[in-house]
Structures are given as structure tokens and as C-alpha cells.
From Swiss-Prot:
This is UPF0280 protein MmarC6_1437. SUPFAM superfamilies: ApbE-like. Belongs to the UPF0280 family. InterPro entries: ApbE-like_sf, MA1715-like, UPF0280. HAMAP family: UPF0280 (MF_01079).
Length: 247
């Protein structure tokens, strides 16, 4: 399967998109523009939606993107903006699927939604940990038939807010929106020495619904809970989201 790749940057939204036909790039850009407009207009009238670190209630008549982010915030007990990157990845892939795209991978700062017709490996990036670039998650094609979310939060890498010190907290869910908010929430509990911090994260993960599993890396230590894809060895030193192999 040949993939076409393009980086799409519109204001703060920076997407790495891989698709099986370049015609889908324009559709993805239109999705970003339209959904950003919906979100920005709502935030202009309701600035608390942008700044809150706690869940925010919204009325029934809000744009779908606002509703989805708010629901994810309540599910993980974080502010709605904790789900923003995963939300754009998911909405892009959903729109492409509706337009008969068979293979699409949307990555937004480590927050991924993908739908592939073949088994696919997504590489792990966990900062300076020795596990970074040496492990990957092998997803079965059946898992991705309607799209699947893999989202990562880090307290040591990137500009996103995390109150913990995990090198990576990767969450797996049918929804990248749910996974993104959950990764942020779980990552906030990565406090203390490595083993204790990992246990704190896994205990928090037990209380979050709608997720399949979680994989946490702090330094040379790792832990998991729930069902995660098969771990395989990889030698690619690349950012999570940049390592995609169809097998």
C-alpha cells in the first residue's frame, strides 16, 4: 500500500496526515478550517472553555466539536481543551472515511486516529527513555476498521500542559477524543519516584471509562493496564506518529 503524506498547519493545528489518495488532503484541510471556526466562535463567547482545567458543562445546541470535547473532559475529569488535538485527528479521519478513504492516519502532536486495511505498527516516542524508538504497538486491521485512537501525553516532551513527570502516557481507545483527554488526566498523576508514579497513573486509569488500555513510561520503567496492542521491537528513533509500517 502506497501512502501519500502531507503536513497541514492551520493556526495552532499541525497535522501529519497519511492517506492512500492525495485528493483527501483538501478534504482534511476543509475539515480543519470548518471545525476550528466552530470551536473558535464558541470559545469567543465562552472563554472558560479554553482556560478551564476542570470539566465544563455545555448546552445541547453547541457545535459537535464542542460537545465531543466537553464529554471527553467529563469522562477523564479534565478541562475540555485536553482533548483538542485528538479531536481534530478523529474528525479528520471520520470525514475521510465517510468519503470512502480506505487508509488514513492523522497525527496531531502525538495524538493519533487511524484507519488502515492492513495491520499497522505505531512507534513509541518517550523522550530520553531507552524504550523510546525501540518499541512499537502492532495494531490489527480489525481494530481499526472504524478508526482507532492512540494518544500520548508527556511531562518531559513537548509544550502541552502536564502536571506529572511521565516520559509518555499512551492511551488506546476507539475514540481519539476520549484517549487524548484520558492521557492528559492519567499523566497528571505521574508524581514521585518512577515506580510509584507509574502505579499512580495506572490506578487513575482504572477509574476512566471508554478506554481499552494504557502504557506508561518513566525513565527505564514501564507499566500497563487493560488491553493494549502487541508490543514489538523497533529500531526507528522517530516521534510517535512518524513510525508507521503496514505489515
Amino acid at each position: 500500500m502506497k501512502f501519500f503524506q502531507e503536513k497541514i498547519s492551520i493556526k495552532e493545528t499541525n497535522i501529519l496526515l497519511k492517506v492512500d489518495n492525495p485528493k483527501f488532503f483538501k478534504m482534511a484541510k476543509n475539515t480543519i478550517i470548518n471545525e476550528r471556526l466552530n470551536l473558535e466562535n464558541y470559545i469567543f463567547r465562552n472563554p472558560i472553555f479554553l482556560t478551564s482545567y476542570s470539566p465544563v458543562e455545555v448546552p445541547d445546541n453547541v457545535p459537535e466539536i464542542v460537545k465531543l470535547m466537553a464529554e471527553a473532559g467529563f469522562n477523564a475529569d479534565v478541562g475540555p481543551m485536553a482533548a483538542v488535538a485528538g479531536t481534530f485527528s478523529q474528525l479528520i479521519v471520520e470525514n475521510l472515511i465517510e468519503n470512502d478513504c480506505k487508509n488514513a492516519i492523522s497525527e496531531n502532536g502525538g495524538d493519533i486516529c487511524l484507519k488502515c486495511e492492513n495491520d499497522t505498527t505505531v512507534g513509541l516516542y518517550a523522550g530520553n527513555s531507552s524504550l523510546s524508538g525501540n518499541l512499537g504497538f502492532k495494531l490489527k486491521k480489525e481494530k481499526m476498521k472504524n478508526g482507532y485512537g492512540i494518544c500520548t501525553s508527556s511531562g518531559t516532551v513537548g509544550h502541552s500542559v502536564s502536571l506529572g513527570n511521565a516520559d509518555s502516557v499512551t492511551v488506546f481507545s476507539k475514540s481519539a477524543i476520549i484517549a487524548d483527554a484520558a492521557a492528559t488526566s492519567i499523566g497528571n498523576f505521574a508524581v514521585g519516584i518512577a515506580v510509584d508514579a507509574i502505579n499512580n497513573c495506572l490506578e487513575k486509569a482504572e477509574n476512566i471509562s471508554k478506554i481499552d488500555g494504557v502504557f506508561v513510561v518513566i525513565g527505564e520503567h514501564a507499566g500497563k493496564i487493560g488491553k493494549i496492542p502487541q508490543l514489538i521491537k523497533t529500531d526507528k528513533k522517530e516521534v510517535l506518529g512518524n513510525v508507521f509500517e503496514l505489515v
